[in-house]
Amino acid sequence: MCAKLESEQIAGLLHVLLKPQLLMAIRVFLWLLSTRIGTLILGGRASLTTQFPFFQSFAYLSTDKQEDILRGWSLSTLGAFRAVYKLFKMITMWAVYTKIENGGFNRNWKAIGYCGADPQVIRSRKCSSNDGVRSNPLQDMVIATQAAGDKLEKVLSRAGVKVLNDDIPLKKLASGNRNRNNSAAGGDLGISCDVVVVGSGCGGGVIASVLAKAGYQVVILEKGKYFRTEDLTTLEGPSQMAMFEKLGSLATDDGGVNLVAGATVGGGTAINWSACFETPSHVLQEWKQISGLELFTSTRYKLAMKKIWHRLNVQPNIARENLQNSVLRAGCEKLSAEVGTLARNAPVDHDCGWCTYGCPSGQKGSTTSTWLKDAAESKNAVLLSECEAQRILFSKNHSGRKHYKARGVMAVVGSSKKRIFIEAQSVVVASGSLMTPPLLLNSGLRNPNIGKGLHLHPVVFMWGYFPEESGFPGTCYEGAIMTSYSPIYKKNGSFPVALLEVPSTHPGSFASFQPWTSAADFKERMRRFSRTVTLCAVTRDTSNGQVSVEADGKPKIDYTLNAVDEETILEGIEKGLRVLIAAGATEIGTHQQDGERFCVKGANSRDIEAYIKRVRSRGVKKNKIIIGSGHHMGSCKMGSDPRRSAVDGEGETWEVEGLYVSDGSVLPSAIGVNPMVTIQSVAYCIAHSVLQSLDSQYKSSTAKL
């Protein structure tokens, strides 16, 4: 029964995650496996048997032969086989280890040493009482549009939002866009405000706070749901499906890079790991040269960064380190390698290992507990959750600085067809580097730089097994997620090209990323889960990807590593393995699909060097190694020249006056460190540019009166 439920869950995930044409290809692939000839074509010699008719369909082959076929796909020279193998392996393992059964538990967790939901949260909720709970200002600001249903207009009116009852303003807003099919329809709703902000993460939260506190009426659109701290389950599977973009399974078009992005109120700040870095000075100098903008080396930017640091209450110290961070620090110290303590937007004693699924204590400085909270307290903002922006509305600008003038946004409520037209003086798009370009392109903007120059900070992983007697207490999933890091330099290099850090580790992600070579081998890997330390190397990439749109308007993300970045990634893998060895791992490995496990105990230096040479020789061929990304930058670059950038030095698009971009997409290149503080600092500068423009418009309109 459990296997049947898991297969149904996997089939459901495939329907949600795959594009129609790819889903059809997978159906054909599976149909072929259900036939003898098809299995022979796809499985080759491994599908042959010694008994008549000498070859069988996949389901009737022995387990050994099935495993041979799967291993063959994983290491195939044909990229299509590797991609299919990776797809099924990752989804299957994730489903098996995140499935919640009766009682909120999974039958595999006890065997692998995993406790499930955060025990501290469970205990605190059992002991707490709802009596006397004060109203949360953010909760009062959020309007769940899908839940409001037919009463949405009344709910908006009660919240102080100006509702447009006349169809004429709706038609004017719709006709302002160059695309078709935007005319008003029955059931549509129109509202008016000063500024509409698309997105509630790093960029959107800062923008909303600055403008609302200045007295302007702000409407924030967020396609994801809002979760109160008391609603957060900290269960891996349900949390990813509710809070992550595309259920946590977003990837580049060829499946080569797995992408993590937030799709909830708070955006990426709700699910990130709290790491705070100031923008490195050498990066700021580089950005000045690339963009032609003085902003990045100005006093204005330094003051903005200082403001962000203060508002996030960034703490430079920690009370204690967990298993993974302790191993990273100890290994670096034994190698005399540089190692530092990560500053975090959380208290020094905040050691929640589940913060990647929202922070139940509310202590992490996500936008929900900082900037959005400030906007809510101003009483000048509302946030419409489960409301996705589909078009920016603009019209010809006969007397302005640019050809077109922003007029508002057309959005859709949840899965319904109900549309909301928001009329505004200014529009700020802060949907992130992966989602901002499609919105601009679908709205009719034509600047050729929109979507180009995407950087992903590609991440690769290494693991080491540390038995209980190794001297490091705890498990891989408990304690503060990120507290230590080590910079990686090129030979004779002055600045880091990558960082060695540790990831959040829970069974579903661990199982989906670990190499699979056989059922028995994978069972052993999972049995060691709680004492397996995973390190990650985050590369400052020079590769350039692109975000474009499919014929149906959906995002298409293309990204290919260049030779320089491939070499940097291999440097990161090598350093991570050496750190694990130095810290005392008894066995180590990578996430290369060959799945080699190297036994450190008893190995001499020659054995170790031979192993590292083998790892390097395998390289980072697409879909032969797991590559992830949680930092997305540069797809709508800021600059002084419209021929080389998508927005100007104020964050305003070159084509449309009053339309701004304020997220990681405006960064001129990869930053090389966790980008939250940098994105918010740039957003703070852009927010004051928007504010200055609004003040100017307000003064102009009052002067005419």
Positions of the model-derived regions?
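Glycine-rich loop(s) and the adjacent beta-strand/alpha-helix scaffold that form part
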Residues: V210-E236, N258, T264, S378, ...
